[in-house]
């Protein structure tokens, strides 16, 4: 595998060419996670006036795309090849790119951080090497195509660690040595592939103060350049019954505190509102006003806004899950007012 990585690196040094982006690195990111797009298109979903979805979003201001990567999902969607296909389209459209590496065969989140099937019998040292090789494999695949991602997440929503049970943590307890070791290994691998890439550690609940998490990460040698947060202010069932006003205010307070305490920028890596709630635009506008006033808040990505019309991915059917109800497109396949507000935001 090292020979492949060396070949790719030499090839890019010789050509020296990467896709150019519409907006400069480090500027305000107005983005969307569109990882379901290729599966939606495969299922025959069309967008407004048959316009390409990426171009549709670019036309109203999108300048960045976030794409997840699973190790080996049974359907093939969101695996490396699918991510690469979408990344090429996004790069051609002048988009800056964030890669969200889950280190799992399916969604990784605060309740699920399942070790990939192929890695199940690994000990800690072998797991570290698997994290390194998978990170390099994903990033060098992009490099070989002339794509230079601006950001990479080492794990997705990992307040409770990753690669469970080996890397599971519980507040200040649990397997912090292992979890922090995984993030440090992913960090070093990412910098090997792209020395100036911004490495993100991502947690959920933008409103929630978690001093114990970042102190433990630092104490055990975890590494990051930027903090990523998820924010779903209308999910009162997730948020202890808090109102959206409370959620937005608490998130703003926490973002400011994280920037001050850890001397690094913060990215809203995921945001979502209810698709059919007339309040959604008001909630988004309030949140955008708050975060654009924060100097070191780097941007915001809407999670899967392109979903509309009750579509759901194939893997949801056997699980008995309903369709995603926080898409931000109208019934005729056009970006809604919520997306207009997000994608026209400025700092």
Feature locations, PLM:
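Positively charged n-region of N-terminal signal peptides that target proteins for export
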Residues: 1-4
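Boundary/entry segment of secreted carbohydrate-active catalytic domains
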Residues: 21-56
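Glycoside hydrolase catalytic-domain groove-lining segments
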Residues: 51-58, 195-198, 209-280, 292, ...
